[in-house]
Structure formats: C-alpha cells, structure tokens
Amino acid sequence: MKINGVKGMNDVLPADVARWHEMEAVAREVFALYGYREVRTPAVEHAALFARGVGEATDIVNKEMYVFEDKGEELLALRPEGTAGTVRAFIEHGAFVEGPQKWFYMGPMFRRERPQKGRYRQFHQIGCEAFGVAEPYLDAEQIALLADYFARLGVTAELKLNSVGDAQCRPAYLADLKAYLVANQGALCADCKDRIERNPLRVLDCKVESCQPVLEQAPRLLERLCEPCRAHFDQVKAGLDALGVAYRVEPRLVRGLDYYVRTAYEFTSDALGSQSAVAGGGRYDRLVETLGGPPTPGIGFALGEERLSMILEKVGRAAPERRPAVFFVSADATGALEALRLAAGLRRAGIACELDPRGGKLKAQFKQAERVGARWAVVLGGNEVATGQAKLKDLQTREETPVALSELAARVSG
C-alpha cells in the first residue's frame, strides 16, 4: 500500500528548490548589509512559550498549534512562528548583556490550519528580529530592509502601515471596540463573534464580505493613540519618507499575535490574483520581559517562502538552477572508466559535470545530456582513451571540435 504525505505537508521538489535557494541567498546578502546575523533554534519548544508569548487568546495557540506530551510528560509544541523561540534563545543565552542585537532565522513552522493554495500545515519562514532599540528609526530601517529584499527579487509589493498603540492607549480603545462589536454582532460572521470576547482587535482583520460594512464603521485606534504612540508613528513615517519607501496607512491593519505594540506593517502583492500578505511584522517592546528577560524593546517580521515562491513563479522569474557544464557520453566500458576519472578532475576544478554509469546507446545518452541542460558533451570510447583525443560537442550550437583530454578543463571552463 502506498503511503502518501501527511495532509497539509508539502514537498518542495528540485525544480522549485532552486528558487528557494535564491530567496534564501538574497535574504542572507541583504540582511548582512543591515547587520543581521543568523540564529538557528529548535522546531520543538515548550508549549508554554507560545501560550505566554504569542497569547492564549490567539487562534494560533487556541486552534492551530501542534501540541504533544513527550515521554517525560512535558507539554511540547511544534513552533507555529519564529519570534517566540528567537526571543527565548536571546534570553537563555544572555545575549542582552552585549547590547542591541540583530538576528535572522529561516526554517519550518507548523500550524494545523485548513490547507489552501500557498498555505500549508508545515510552512517555511524567513524572519528578522532586532533587540534593544526603542527608537522609531529602527522600525523604518527594518521596513526598508524588507523593501530592498523584495526589490532585489523583482517583486512588486505594497507596504501597509499602522500603529496598534500600547498598554497606555489600547485598553480604553479595546473596550470601545468591544462594545461596538457586541452591538453589531448580528451582522458579523461566526469567527468574528467568537473573537469579540477572546481577541476583539483581530475582528478588524476579517476578510468576509458580509462583515465589511460593520468593520468600516468601527472605532479606529489611530484616532485614539496616546501622544507617545502618535509621536512614534509620525517618526516611523518620517523615516520611511527619508528612505524613499512608499507606504499606505491602513487603520484596520492588525497583527494576529498579542505581543505587538505600536508599529504594525504588512507587504502585500496582487500577483496571485488578490491583495495577499507576503510578509508582516511589528514592534514587541514587552515580549522579552514577558518571557523572563530584562525589559528590552524589539521589532521583527516574517515572510512566507511558499507564497513568495509562488509570486516569483507567477511573475515569470526563472529559478536559477546550476546546470552541468559537461556530460560524458560513454561508447564502451573503457570510455566509461575514463569518464569517471575525468569527471572527478573537472569537479575538483569546480566544473560541474555528469555521466551515465549505465552507458547504453549514444543517442539516448545525448538526449540525457540535453535533458540535464549540459553545455558540452564529450564522447569517450577505447579509441579516444588510447589517443588522448575526443570530440567536444557544443549542445547549443551543435558544433563539434577535437579536444585533447588533457586540455578539457581549460576548454570548458570559459
């Protein structure tokens, strides 16, 4: 009986992995320009980390997190997002004593949500976290980093910006919002009704069409910001203006995690047919303290690799895949052995090459050479080995020229 993959867990095949390599390589290049260093944290953490850090009232913790008991009866979880684990590592290893830190991560996350195009139960994120700086110009710089990253990949994305306030101004707003939503809950969908008590701010993020008239008239947090939050938001916008990063203020933009304060932002793209989020982030000035560390401001973002890969494919960006320079076509056993030896030498010289150990008909081997995208084909048999000369075929121009086997590396390395 055939065993298929688990529902919602997606295979990324070699043709697509090449695009992922590019996304990750460009991320490393751009992040390094801004001073971010890579951190790697486990996929498994204590479930309490996310309950406390992400928020027990969130859909992620309430409905979507994979939680299990190990043999020691500890309650563990597959990480549903990357920030909490990165903050835990920042605290556990005492990185805060070294002053401000900029870290980035890449890896799989897990949420048991309904699988759909571009969304899987195992998905991959690239994220940045900056610790130790409360000033708003860091917010602008990090957003500019993400804008630079998308530009390098040739992706057009719109920046949506908002402030979600803080502990000083948000509670009074949430009370007003909750009262408004309760008064109008008859016009809201079931999910929105459920969130009114648990997480009323998330109701504003609902995409259900029938909810929109109510949400359009909902109280706006931007109009209720305290003076420090308003000043912070104004300086973030000034920083983005100075950096030449275009943005649109979106009063209904909220983040799905409880730890966000002040700056919240998303990059969206319509490349997949509708305005869908490609990346999102914001400020979390109390999270380090909430998880047991000293008071430390922070800001971070995450982007989804699956969705970004789909966008790159949609806009026609070819996945850069390294092809072999040379394919050895073996005419007989003597030629196959010599191909093995020559291939080893070319690889030591940094030249990619392939051969078919099965040998077989020359026509079939030439077809394989074209299938793998080789630039050159070299036919080897007993006669070529004896004379030290072979024919070098350019598979693009179809021209054949003689080549001394001792000079093969020089001929194909250009």
Swiss-Prot record:
What species is given as this protein's source? Anaeromyxobacter dehalogenans (strain 2CP-1 / ATCC BAA-258)
State which gene encodes it. hisS
* Organism lineage string: Bacteria, Pseudomonadati, Myxococcota, Myxococcia, Myxococcales
**Protein family according to the UniProt entry:** Belongs to the class-II aminoacyl-tRNA synthetase family.
Subcellular localization, per the record?
A: Cytoplasm
On whether Nucleotide-binding is a keyword of this UniProt record, the answer is yes
Q: Which reaction does it catalyse?
A: tRNA(His) + L-histidine + ATP = L-histidyl-tRNA(His) + AMP + diphosphate + H(+)
The family database entries (CDD domains) matched by this protein are listed as: HisRS-like_core, HisRS_anticodon
Q: Which GO terms of type biological process are on file?
A: histidyl-tRNA aminoacylation
User: Per the UniProt record, which EC number(s) apply here?
Assistant: 6.1.1.21
What's the name of the protein?
Histidine--tRNA ligase
